[in-house]
Amino acid sequence: MKLSFNTWPYSCFPIWVPSYPLEEAIKRIAKIGYDGIEIGAAAPHAYPKYLNPARRKEIKQILDDNGIALSSMLPAPGGGPGFNPSSPLAEERAEMLDQYQQVIELCAQWGGKTVIYLAGWQVYGTSRKQAWEWSREGLVKVAKMAADHGVTMVVEPQAVDTNLIEGCDDAIQMMEEVGAPNVKLMFDTIHVMYRNEVPSDYVYQMGKNLHHVHISDTDRLPPGQGRGDFISVVNALKEVDFEGYLTMEIGFHRRDIEPDKVAREAYAYMKPLVG
């Protein structure tokens, strides 16, 4: 089990929190002690179209020089430059495929092996069945792209942000319907708690298909500062022999945060638990 930190609180997403260049975020996160870094493929850090070949090589060298691995990547969220895999617009779904292709290639270039699949949301006037089918069809195609680069796609249930894949059963159903060996599962503790469910239950339900985990206490606080039971989560992960990354996705819930502080606090709390 390894610890990773997501770059959102260093990137001005989704609100105008302090913004730092990607290389600065990498150095700070590595200095704290994290094994990995999860990079959002969005401006200002890593929107693929904004990164020329020289810049890509530069970031890979910075990762190597600081002894930190790319644990995972995820695309720009919906809205703005983002996209909806379940969109009724064929053009938007096509853009989703192009964007995922670019994110997968970038992830592989930087030594990463995991990309998060955000299934999208049902738009008014579209049936849930149709929205689901569009998202499923998209993931089938994306999984083939990822397989060519040795990348695993992980389906994330997002109760706070979507109305399509909200819980554990939804994610498992999507994975099973796609049926690709490189499509696995993940969960974020804040989404589980939003549904008034128990995060450690997700560990047991996902079992051997659990590939990645996001750690966040209530209100995107560092673990140990809200109501989350992370001792039980880690104990459950040990029981199922989880060997992936626990990524802190925290600290972007308000403007006046200090990203180094929340990163240190999360590491100090989680490191003794994982050993």
Question: Locations of the language-model features?
Answer:
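Short glycine/proline-rich, acidic loop/turn segments that cap or connect secondary-structure elements
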Residues: 230-246
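Active-site-proximal loop/turn and secondary-structure-junction residues that shape catalytic pockets
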Residues: 9-11, 41-43, 76-79, 119-123, ...
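Acidic/histidine-rich catalytic cores of soluble enzymes
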Residues: 36, 130-132, 136-235
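Surface-exposed cleft-lining segments at the edges of enzyme active sites
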Residues: 86-91, 121-131, 157-163
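Active-site groove signature of glycoside hydrolases
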Residues: 107-127, 149-158
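N-terminal pre-domain/capping segments
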Residues: 1-112, 140, 147, 180, ...
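Hydrophobic faces of well-ordered beta-strands that scaffold small-molecule active sites
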Residues: 3-7, 37-39, 70-75, 115-117, ...
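Short active-site-adjacent structural elements
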Residues: 222-223, 245, 254-258
